[in-house]
Amino acid sequence: MKTLGILAISFILIFFSCRKDSFITSGDARVTITADTLKYDTVFVSTGSTYRTFKIINENNQKLRLSSLKLMGGAASVYKINVDGIPGTQFSNLEIEGNDSLYVFAQVNVNPGTANLPFILRDSIEISFNGNKRLVQLEAWGQNAHFFRNKVIAANETWNNDLPYVILGSLLINTNQTLTINKGCRIYVHADAPILINGTILVNGLKDTANRVYFQGDRLDEPYKDYPASWPGIFFQPSSKDNVFTYAVIKNAYQAIGLQDLPPNANPKLTLNECVIDNAYDAGIISINSSVRARNCLISNCGKNLFLVKGGDYQFTHCTVATYANRFIDHRDPVLTVSNYIGINNVPAAEDLTAAFRNCIFWGENGLVDNEVFTAKNNTKAFNVTFSQILWKVTSTPAFINPPTGVISNLSPKFDSINTSRNYYDFRLQKGGSPAINAGLNFGVTTDLDGKPRPAGLPDLGCFEKQ
């Protein structure tokens, strides 16, 4: 009897071992493919996308044999695939253990062409098993572009909106030279490519969305297209002068704009008219003893929105400066810091400071900040800071400033729509509900960030006029 029991157990073990080692051949085998389409956002010619992936899951206890897995476009396809790390265009007799899976990775590389409009690139992966055929579609948008690697503007140059501009390595504008960027241009900047301005840059956008000029990172695929710190930023060196940005959008940088030292002439080093600076990881504008004139600008969701230190000369009119902590940005710093000094090796270096903020909103939520406006003064240099017609979030009036006028403290501006979970922000004002409506004075600004008219009487605070 003991011998019979041992034989029975052995038979059972062998039976299940054979089942596990056998292949399921039924056309009804339970197989899950985790995607029916792999989509890629805009991919520039001569550059590759990131990999997209899907799994083929064998939900059976027995092994599954894929008779073939092939890239339908073959070797001529713009797509490249690999299966569990092995590259190729066609694979045969792939085995998947019971209740196991394999990974398929796909990447697209766009060949150069002449089209200036985005074009669609399609292919598919065919998976065959047990008489079944399944297709996973591949779909990408290709885009030709001007590619510049370590580009130097050594003579005056103009960029027009014929193709996007992709910056690799760096872009340098030499002293006394001017780069003019006309309406509708799109500038995509690689992760290691700062824009360095020793000379002058003129950005001539227009109010319509299609005619604004955009600066952003060159990763346009999900989820990277929304990441801050995707590229270094735009940096104005001591010799730079007479820079003007009109209807420009600068987003997803590390430091969107950095300025050092006053210009060599009496004009502002940088003028910003109707511009958006958004989602900068460290700072929207960081300025060290420099000069900025800003009108109708939105500086939103940055590590430090405005960081103006070691003096300088600043004027911000009808600007909305706001940050809501979200999954990309920890709101740990005030949206506005103004100081006439900076510590260098624990020694304060100070310069004269003049700053005026008129018809502006300074607001933040969901972070660690109670005072959204911070001021600091060194008594060895001038400190002349004025706030007129302001809505701000503070626990007390900032120190050292001139007596402010027309102040609204700690009342929510009631922006139109804020949804941090969806990463959606509309900083226009709620009609009839915002205390910023009709709270301004006429400082000669006749339109808003949308290009819509402001009244001759009492305008709204911030960059948007409620229509």
Task: Tell me what each language-model feature is.
Residues 287, 292-428, 455:
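Predominantly extracellular beta-rich ligand-binding scaffolds that present long acidic/polar faces
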Residues 159, 179-181, 201-206, 210, ...:
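All-beta strand scaffolds that present successive hydrophobic residues in beta-strands
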Residues 14-17:
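C-terminal motif of bacterial Sec signal peptides marking the signal peptidase cleavage site
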Residues 51-58, 121-128, 234, 248:
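Buried hydrophobic-core signal for structured, non-transmembrane domains
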Residues 405-467:
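C-terminal accessory segments
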Residues 152-160, 173-186, 192-219:
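Beta-solenoid repeat scaffold
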